[in-house]
């Protein structure tokens, strides 16, 4: 029962998929970040379904773009937009953190979101779907969430409130880190065997950048920064996927 509640907590927070409602407590939140990667598996499964349907290329690419937004409800895009606004302010640490809490969407966020979707759509049109491509991308979507959960459990926090603090403080950090490290290792091994090693490199480079930016610019991570990482990792891994296929590796 606790396992199902733990999964429900993760899906209730990080997806728009309807799940049974439970009261969040210490027990069912302790390992919620371990269940977070399952949302990536759902996104990947729907991505493969879209790829397998006999759709025109542009319609299929549009589906590839929209699936992660529909599944997650845009929660990570919200964090991406807020972080882009904060970074574009070139203000001090406290000003950036204040911008993250501002519910309004600034001009820089709109510009970055439009640029993001244009790049994402272009890359989706460049990818020719095959079962192998679909499997690689599903593994990548799970991997990025494993890394995101690992960061929540191990990176310093910018403040003692907010989404990241809620899940980090409730987590059994040692156990969560152990599970997600093993999962990330297994996913990476599978991607290497499939010829998608470049996707791992892309994810790790964005992960490193995430740590550097969060420490230097914000004094730690927040829920918005976690969304910023996830969206950037997804875009760069998609670029790596297209490059691997173009180079004949996939």
Q: Where are the predicted features?
A:
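Acidic (Asp/Glu-rich) catalytic motifs at the cytosolic membrane interface
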Residues: 67-105, 212-233
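Multi-pass membrane catalytic core of lipid/isoprenoid biosynthesis enzymes
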Residues: 29-47, 86-132, 136-137, 174-188, ...
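Membrane-embedded alpha-helical segments that form the functional core of polytopic membrane enzymes
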Residues: 34-84, 134-139, 195-216
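Membrane-proximal soluble regions of multi-pass membrane proteins
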Residues: 1-24
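Solvent-exposed interhelical
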Residues: 146-180, 217-222
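N-terminal beta-alpha supersecondary unit
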Residues: 9-12, 26-51, 165-169
């Amino acid at each position: 029962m606790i396992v199902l509640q733990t999964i429900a907590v993760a899906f209730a927070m990080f997806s728009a998929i309807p799940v049974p409602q439970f009261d969040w407590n210490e027990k069912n939140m302790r390992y919620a970040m371990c269940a977070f990667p399952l949302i990536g598996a759902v996104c990947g499964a729907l991505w493969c379904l879209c790829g397998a349907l006999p759709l025109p290329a542009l319609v299929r690419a549009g589906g590839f773009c929209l699936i992660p937004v529909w599944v997650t409800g845009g929660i990570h895009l919200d964090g991406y937009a807020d972080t882009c606004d904060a970074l574009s302010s070139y203000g001090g640490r406290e000003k950036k953190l204040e911008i993250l809490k501002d519910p309004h969407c600034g001009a820089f966020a709109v510009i970055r979101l439009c640029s993001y979707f244009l790049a994402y759509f272009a890359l989706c049109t460049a990818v020719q779907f095959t079962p192998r491509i679909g499997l690689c991308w599903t593994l990548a979507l799970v991997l990025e969430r494993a890394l995101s959960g690992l960061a929540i459990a191990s990176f310093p926090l910018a403040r003692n409130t907010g989404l990241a603090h809620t899940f980090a403080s409730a987590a059994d950090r040692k156990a969560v880190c152990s599970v997600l490290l093993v999962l990330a290792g297994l996913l990476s091994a599978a991607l290497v065997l499939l010829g998608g090693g470049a996707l791992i490199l892309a994810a790790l480079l964005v992960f490193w950048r995430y740590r550097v930016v969060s420490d230097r610019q914000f004094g730690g991570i927040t829920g918005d920064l976690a969304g910023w990482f996830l969206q950037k990792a997804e875009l760069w891994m998609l670029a790596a996927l297209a490059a691997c296929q173009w180079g004949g590796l996939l």
